[in-house]
Structures are given as structure tokens and as C-alpha cells.
Amino acid sequence: MTIEEDASIWFNVVIRGDNDPIIIGKRSNVQDGSVLHTDLGAPLNIGQGVTVGHKVMLHGCTISNNSLIGINSTILNHAKIRENSIVGANSLITEGKEFPKNSLIMGLSLIHI
């Protein structure tokens, strides 16, 4: 696991990099009660300046720079959220889903605006 400069991890966060690496980029924050986990072949990469809201589950996915993951969202293996994107609260991003830069993603990853 790598936590880069000025990144913050808040209370009751679980970070499990037992299967593959986890990288948390500079100035990113992972808020209370979130879970970061990997699977074999599915590392977790959080870019720079990312906000991971309260009670978020990130599982073997990629969150690119300057993105925000809303409270209680789940993002599964091999999903990719590109730069400057927002995932709305309580969203589910299923395995392998990819979204372009500057996306607003809400719900069950069926709606892309």
C-alpha cells in the first residue's frame, strides 16, 4: 500500500491490499467508514486530489485525478472513473464499467450525463 504526500485517511477506514497493491494519490482523502480492497489482478488506484466520501466501497478499481466519489457508493473490479468526474451518492458502478473524463455518474451506472 502506498499513501502519497498530503493524503488523508479518516476514522474507521479499512484498507486491504492483501491481494494486489493499493495506491492513494497526493492530496486525496478517504472519509470515515470506507473500505478499500483488491482482488488478484485488480489493484486499486486512487489518483491525486480525489475525495472518497463516507462509507464508500472501492474494490479493485481506478479513480482518476480530481474526482469525487459520493457517500455510500460502491465501485467494483476493473471499473474506471476518469479525471474530473463525480459519482453521485449511493451509486453502484459494476465490474469493468468505464466512464470518460468530466462525467457525472449516478445510480446503477446505467445513466451517463
Regions found by a protein language model. Give the residues of each.
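Glycine-rich hexapeptide-repeat left-handed beta-helix
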Residues: 18-34, 38-48, 53-111
